[in-house]
From Swiss-Prot:
Record Pfam families: Pkinase
Coiled-coil residues: none
Family annotation (InterPro entries): GSK-3, Kinase-like_dom_sf, Prot_kinase_dom, Protein_kinase_ATP_BS, Ser/Thr_kinase_AS, STKc_GSK3
Residues with PTM Phosphotyrosine: Y262
Task performed by this protein: May mediate extracellular signals to regulate transcription in differentiating cells.
Source organism: Arabidopsis thaliana
Catalytic activity: L-seryl-[protein] + ATP = O-phospho-L-seryl-[protein] + ADP + H(+); L-threonyl-[protein] + ATP = O-phospho-L-threonyl-[protein] + ADP + H(+)
Keyword ATP-binding: yes
The protein's name: Shaggy-related protein kinase beta
Entry superkingdom: Eukaryota
Cleavable signal peptide: none
Amino acid sequence: MNVVRRLTSIASGRNFVSSDNVGETETPRSKPNQNREETESTETTSYEKDSVSSSENSDHLPKEIREDMDCGIIKGNGTESGRIITTKKKGLNDQKDKTISYRAEHVIGTGSFGVVFQAKCLETEEKVAIKKVLQDKRYKNRELQIMRMLDHPNVVELKHSFFSTTEKDELYLNLVLEYVPETIYRASRSYTKMNQHMPLIYIQLYTYQICRAMNYLHQVVGVCHRDIKPQNLLVNNVTHEVKICDFGSAKMLIPGEPNISYICSRYYRAPELIFGATEYTSAIDMWSVGCVMAELFLGHPLFPGETSVDQLVEIIKILGTPAREEIKNMNPRYNDFKFPQIKAQPWHKIFRRQVSPEAMDLASRLLQYSPNLRCTALEACAHPFFDDLRDPRASLPNGRALPPLFDFTAQELAGASVELRHRLIPEHARK
């Protein structure tokens, strides 16, 4: 196995370049509604119009798909600048259906999953993001099913959904989402380009909100995101409110049921996934959160592996060789596998800058080999690293107030001990 040769060379002080150059994208290649970072060309024309057709053309589709429809299917599938998309939204409580029109403005993201474009609702002047994904006509779309369940300040809001077709009779699902202008990825890179570090208050603020969103997904909804990375973390650059997006890989994990291990973008992929585990838990998301937090301090990925083998090597170079029990906890099938002994590096040498003991402690609690030893999302929110946010005098660098951080619902705190609740909600925020 190449990982053993790589680690043996590291242990002996030699450099070894792996010949394992198997092409591996940053995200898995398994189904149409999973996000993948590849390019797709688009055209630009102006002021063409797509309009909703009658529901008759949906009659040939399976019942599962028809149940997902708010209206009929739109004929045409344009995302070109200026194109008008007119659809309908079902009225609530016996109210009439609403006609809604969107004007496509420009593409803001592309990939094998489809395309995301910015648009404006003509009735309200509100900016939205529309994610268009190819829909398998045989199945319900898992991303749509999950997004309809979500309602949290740190999760991007699904406003509307509709289906559209092409001349080739391809069916596309269009998810109309709230528009958030920035990503944590771009925010982090902007500091790196200026040879600056992201201010600590932003690292604390962003990581805290990610953890709060993870607690909501894991404990309230029962969903594992499975692709947490800076590109999937939206941030409002005025309020600095963070929202998780892209649920194309998300899934409700059922104990005892197998799942694919080739999931999650490589740099943020938990080691049990690299070991091929199929009965993993939402702890894979918490590993990803630890990777994101470290990246905000470093300005670059903590574990930048070029292949799955290289990824494991990068992890072991920092965390050291996993103990036999840790390997068993990640995947029992690898219980007897022997790795060369590599010592773990202390965190202060990893960060190479003045980082608080609290920050290093949280990173170490998130980046544990054993999934069951990683702290939960709610435990992470209560960590002393975030105590600055709980200070009643805390504010953004420009003096503006922090976004709401402590307005937990009863569902979010369900099962939390009195002590944990006390640590989570500062006295000034208690009702």
